């Protein structure tokens, strides 16, 4: 066998070695994503082997075959991500591209595309058969994200295109591989897409892609830290420290967008598309115009091409001055930005919100850019490139103050956007006045420390001591070292033995390892039943998340057709004999107005009747009614008949999603006791506190009459008749006010039960997510025992099972049918174990009224 010349072998090794290092880095990066569950909900990891293997094959192919291979690989990614819906997406996409190239007048093609968009919009709103039927909501969002902006750019450039472009390139522009899992996608420019394809040496582009992906992972981890540990609910904001954290974290959550966009561009670089960065050191912007140039650069370029330049040229043609033309064109850009964000929201979620809060946000930002532009065009303006200017203390101080001011401004604006309520926002800022002198001093020292660090960093940057931060090009060996070292450190930090050795810092690292709701949003999941605006308005920040079919059905029950409003402290109740769709399952009520089977109002002889009260988990939100823990427990009681004195067992489920302690009391007094139960079982979760706090705050702010004893508790907490809802929430959350309300509710329920000869029993069910943010078992069970109730402790019911396997939906902490089966098994065991507390006689036991041990 003829051996290859040494020179050839060496040349091949020189090519293969960098490719091998790149593959190794990719495997490490995707391992980091797996260990920390980064972008788990997007499905990125399902494409990991396709991306890594596809890169290896793509890089080895002759250049002429790479683009067709990338297109085929992208279509494969769409199939993996969307299943059979990918066929419809591909067919519709090819049809749209074909319309762009019809041999008819350009205006006719634009009209056809616009007509297609209108039909698609109607399909989204009305559900036209054949368009949305059988096609997932996510597939619709992905398809829309492929074309809603890119086809505008494509048609704009197509009109001036003179060079023949292969069909594989044209289709690849729309069917970009990462778009299969990221519907919220950067607006890639058609010209840049073509121009940057292998515009640098391949290995340099590939390694840049790896570095961008790693940087994206870092951004996502930083976002997760901000989201889990810094973001706060408005009612938890009080004083200078929490106000500062609330403002800053509102702007810092943009790291999520930045991380995703870095990932997208990094993946595309692996296949030769050397696209520019989408976001660049945006937290260091020194002016509104500087921020506009740094943040979401693709959007800025899109607006310049489609709106700014045409508007500017049209104004110039009308003999309007250059200064006025630039200012007016900038105004056009920001009006268009406001409208197009709603347009984007429509395609991704299905609603077209035009709120004045958004108008103010974009209006203020646009006005700042206009003023900044006017100042730069003024006769005294002087632009000095920081790179060419020498360093001076005065220049450094000015620049750092501008950066700090811009960060503060954007933090304030994003907090305005996330709060959604001007009165609440102003109240939060006003709470700074109540700060202690020591807190103000510490805050001032912190600001000074940041300022000094900024001046030092400014000096270091001018001396070239950047450690590669912000550089778009690094030597291959240095880039590989940084990526490998960073990935290995992250993987090491995920090891349990390392985390244990780090103490509290290790616990913080552990908290970053999974995708979950933070304290604020976990509370919102409960509070949403009361605060319709939280769930029906658009998101609290511009980080769009596409909802699939199950998630889109997460409508608070108080906003559904299943309830009627009572006009008093109960707020709402279920309508009798009604079937509606809610949280992925049919919600059917019986003639008694409860979500349960039909039962006679009068208890029949030989029947043992349990009444059940609680909130959404107890009502079995998201689960099939006949497979809820209540129904399963009832079936087993009737099958096994633990007490031979009873021939029939009934569990009447009076629970209603969104109810709090005060509504448990009203439900007991108005409904439960009317049906002569033997036992009242109170289903309790730690989340009951957040629901109760928001519900009572809503009622108190509207001066709805409350129980005199409850009103007295509110007055003791300093809650007057004229207090606003945010102030009421804050005062309810301070001290032991919620504990007093809970104790009052349990005591009142127990008293009413004893008056009617009913046994009150307390049942604690742990949250699927976590109890770490709310009072838990000890406090709640202590109050229940003090009220004379027996206590069923169901903690540990989910042990041994992955929590994600038991959740109704990744964004919904309600248990699914598997979770309900676990609860039913445990509840039945507890009923047998504490049979005397239930007034049951099983195998020689004698009944007793309560079990407070």
Predicted regions and their residues:
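Membrane-embedded transmembrane alpha-helical bundles that form the catalytic cores
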Residues: 2-495
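Serine-dependent acyl-ester chemistry module
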Residues: 517-531, 685-789, 794-809, 841-844, ...
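Alpha-helical transmembrane signal-anchor/signal-peptide segments
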Residues: 498-516
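Histidine-centered active-site loop/cap adjacent to the catalytic His
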Residues: 810-853
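Membrane/wall-proximal cationic-aromatic binding patches
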Residues: 516-644, 800-802
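Generic structural signal for small/hydrophobic residues in well-ordered secondary structure
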Residues: 150, 183, 341, 615, ...
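Internal alpha/beta domain cores that form substrate/cofactor-binding pockets in large enzymes
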Residues: 609-611, 636, 641, 647-675, ...
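Short, solvent-exposed loop/turn and secondary-structure capping segments
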Residues: 346-351, 621-625, 663-665, 691-697
